[in-house]
Amino acid sequence: MRFTRSILHQYAQETVRQRERTEPDLHAAYLVGSLLDPEPLLGGTTDIDVILVHKYQAPVERETLAITPEVSLDLFHRTRNDYEQHRQFRRDPWMGYPLTFNHILLFDTDHWLEFIQASVSAEFHRVDNVLARVNTLSSTARASWFTLIQNTTLPHQEWLRNYLEILSLAAIAIAGLIGAPLTTRRFLVTVKVSCE
């Protein structure tokens, strides 16, 4: 079977419909990750990332289900309380960006998620919010760098792994000046274009 963005979106919608029937406290669901890209497949593989928001309690933090060897379904469970300070998501590079996209809603009780989306999207690209998102990432990279150069006892492989993670965070911060943070799967494909 040849997967298209539309077919992957249908899988996500069907999963949420099934969860509506089996999880009565499901409050909202939306897409994140590679399905927000025009080309979600990378090398013929992808994952369908869905955030399920529960009214009171999330049954687990995360579930991963294989649809085929090439496609997996990642379900992240959150509660409504996680969204109480939703305006702060304007300054959060990981939570904020997905909420600014159109066509991500899979399920929404009483237009709750639409309201959250509108609140996050308003002034999301204002300079102070962009800089706050970038500073979060660059400060972490900088602190990690100073920790790394002071630690002379690390084995070479661990030092190198930490060094590459720091470079990754720095590149993600630079890319954040003009757009969404780079993801692990597409990092090498998109880092050059994003940082130019």
Residue locations for each model-derived region?
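Internal, well-ordered alpha/beta segment that forms a basic, Gly-enriched binding/recognition surface
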Residues: R80-W145
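Metal-dependent nucleotidyltransferase catalytic core
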Residues: M1-H27, V32-F101
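A sequence-composition feature that detects small, non-aromatic residues
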Residues: A12, A28-A29, A58, A66, ...
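Weak global preference for isoleucine
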Residues: I7, L35, I48-V53, I67, ...
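Conserved nucleotidyltransferase catalytic core and NTase-mimicking acidic/glycine-rich helix/loop elements
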Residues: N129-E196
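Short, functional N-terminal and low-complexity linear motifs
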Residues: R17-R19, Y83, L106-W112, Q157-W159, ...
